[in-house]
Amino acid sequence: MTPPENKNLVDENKELIQEVLKAYPEKSRKKREKHLNVHEENKSDCGVKSNIKSVPGVMTARGCAYAGSKGVVWGPIKDMIHISHGPVGCGYWSWSGRRNYYVGVTGINSFGTMHFTSDFQERDIVFGGDKKLTKLIEELDVLFPLNRGVSIQSECPIGLIGDDIEAVAKKTSKQIGKPVVPLRCEGFRGVSQSLGHHIANDAIRDWIFPEYDKLKKENRLDFEPSPYDVALIGDYNIGGDAWASRMLLEEMGLRVVAQWSGDGTLNELIQGPAAKLVLIHCYRSMNYICRSLEEQYGMPWMEFNFFGPTKIAASLREIAAKFDSKIQENAEKVIAKYTPVMNAVLDKYRPRLEGNTVMLYVGGLRPRHVVPAFEDLGIKVVGTGYEFAHNDDYKRTTHYIDNATIIYDDVTAYEFEEFVKAKKPDLIASGIKEKYVFQKMGLPFRQMHSWDYSGPYHGYDGFAIFARDMDLALNSPTWSLIGAPWKKAAAKAKAAA
């Protein structure tokens, strides 16, 4: 039963939402009202609408379908060349976008931080760019002979003029003897980067899995199966996250045969269907391919969470339960090994952080997955929301958040600022677009997209870094220096009086 004081807080937060909405014209207010709510315990849903186009004219943090395909799913595949097919301006999302760490020699056998563009000009819009794209792929294969394949990431003009990139892909694939994957991920498609994820997943299904089927049929799969093979999917190795996750999986006796897509390779994409279990970290961006693997190959899949010691231990046990007693015993040994280490981290940082509050606004999985990590440190989440979630994301979020938590979907810059002013959280955890706004308001901030150039945050080792970074953000002595001297003097005089 909800305590009376929490009932009051629910009502208070609902009133806050209505107050914030008053700034909009009636039509916009009605639209935005559906995306804002206060979570009430025992509800199976957060009660917000999602995956709907943003209200025209507002400041939204969303990206486009091209960003979802190139910047998230395909871009981190390190041994493929990813062509940004269109004007060079979209290159903002084309290189060094997400700190996807990888092992390899850039420009020789790895291309993760390189920018390849067809540099569309006006004449290409008029006459079409198929010949230019064909020549580009041929030249790139000569310049970088160790590439394993090419992906064509379409920008807006490609879809508008109707270039046949599929025909180019089939033709050039035969010429260079490597996979060439076309992606219709033009930025105008869909309402956010989420459709780009879906398009990217479908391209793996339609253009990569047939290669697996062919190799298996011809008995040419260079793969020795084991009963402990898993595919690690939806981890983009931001700051080394996938390595931290992989280390724990291997320590408990599992073999990671495919890592998608941070530090991943084309071969790992191809042999993904050979795994016994799919472990998905970022549900939003890769649940589509998990469902395809289940439908086509009968592969089971599960979402896991390696943020914070509480959820790490729970996830290790859930994963181990899918295997035999050997793996289950190993999981317990891994948990026992790291428990004293985590206790030492908590003993050091929890007293310094306990009682603080945080408001989250990120994409993907983090608005829910990082909640337990904050709670392990004694930090309470008072608001959370997604940039591009779907309804099932918000259903999954109910298992993570407390009663009276403010929920905001595709929150506008205005709304987020007003919520922060009213709730006065001690910390904001969001993205680069929000960072400097709140820092100028004198609020501690941590980036939850790129970890503010820190990390990893996954796994036991990552939690120690996470705790340190939250402590640095909240307890930095610089916060005592941001007040204007005349305001400090006035405050002292008032206190003395």
Swiss-Prot record:
Annotated [7Fe-Mo-9S-C-homocitryl] cluster binding sites: C282, H449
CDD domains documented for this protein: Nitrogenase_MoFe_alpha
List of residues binding [8Fe-7S] cluster: C64, C90, C156
Pfam family, one: Oxidored_nitro
Cofactor binding note from Swiss-Prot or TrEMBL: Binds 1 [8Fe-7S] cluster per heterodimer. Binds 1 [7Fe-Mo-9S-C-homocitryl] cluster per subunit.
Any one GO cellular component localisation term in the record: molybdenum-iron nitrogenase complex
InterPro entries with a match to the protein in the record: Nase/OxRdtase_comp1 (IPR000510), Nase_comp1_asu (IPR010143), Nase_comp1_CS (IPR000318), Nase_Mo-Fe_asu (IPR005972)
Names of the cofactor(s): [8Fe-7S] cluster; [7Fe-Mo-9S-C-homocitryl] cluster
PROSITE patterns for the chain: NITROGENASE_1_1, NITROGENASE_1_2
Keywords: ATP-binding, Iron, Iron-sulfur, Metal-binding, Molybdenum, Nitrogen fixation, Nucleotide-binding, Oxidoreductase
The UniProt record lists the keyword Oxidoreductase: yes
Catalytic activity: N2 + 8 reduced [2Fe-2S]-[ferredoxin] + 16 ATP + 16 H2O = H2 + 8 oxidized [2Fe-2S]-[ferredoxin] + 2 NH4(+) + 16 ADP + 16 phosphate + 6 H(+)
Quaternary context: Tetramer of two alpha and two beta chains. Forms complex with the iron protein (nitrogenase component 2).
Family the entry assigns: Belongs to the NifD/NifK/NifE/NifN family.
Main function: This molybdenum-iron protein is part of the nitrogenase complex that catalyzes the key enzymatic reactions in nitrogen fixation.
Protein name: Nitrogenase molybdenum-iron protein alpha chain
Naturally occurring in which organism (per UniProt): Nostoc sp. (strain PCC 7120 / SAG 25.82 / UTEX 2576)
Upper lineage: Bacteria, Bacillati, Cyanobacteriota, Cyanophyceae, Nostocales
Gene: nifD
